[in-house]
């Protein structure tokens, strides 16, 4: 079937102020971004997760190598679920799925292609393959459809 304007599903990205189920964070560990074994960054991430976990779910993506450490620091924090997922850095907003709602209000995730903010020409770091898989992992884990970036077009309300 050919996709036309009439049969195309329309999605919208909810505002940050709208009710939502939870958020995704990535446990910091990458030496190029976090000095001293990321100890201070991890303490800060624990505080953020504690604050958020009071009012909504926190899904913390943690590498296999860091899982025991994360359990020790986050194991008693209310609302936090640890999920084993290998990543290249800790920027869930940039590498994760953009959650959108379809016309019926069902949640879907958009999997944008992540390239470390510039790719092979000017990217911040060379290996971002793990980060590029995070969005699909989040969608699978949360049980929501994952929209391919190639079939997604952004429009503002002024354009519609």
Descriptions of predicted regions:
Residues 4-8, 139-151:
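Conserved alpha/beta core surface patches that mediate binding of polyanionic ligands
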Residues 59, 80-86, 144-149:
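General small-molecule cofactor/ligand-binding pocket signal
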Residues 72-140:
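A generic, well-ordered mixed alpha/beta core segment in the N-terminal half of proteins
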Residues 150, 154-160:
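Single conserved hydrophobic/aromatic residue that forms the stacking wall/gate
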Residues 26-29, 62, 84, 102, ...:
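Pocket-edge structural micro-motifs
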Residues 13-17, 89-94, 100, 151-153:
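Structural signature of eukaryotic scaffold interfaces centered on beta-propeller domains
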Residues 1-74:
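N-terminal leader/transition segments
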Residues 66, 117, 160:
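Surface-exposed, flexible loop/turn segments at secondary-structure boundaries
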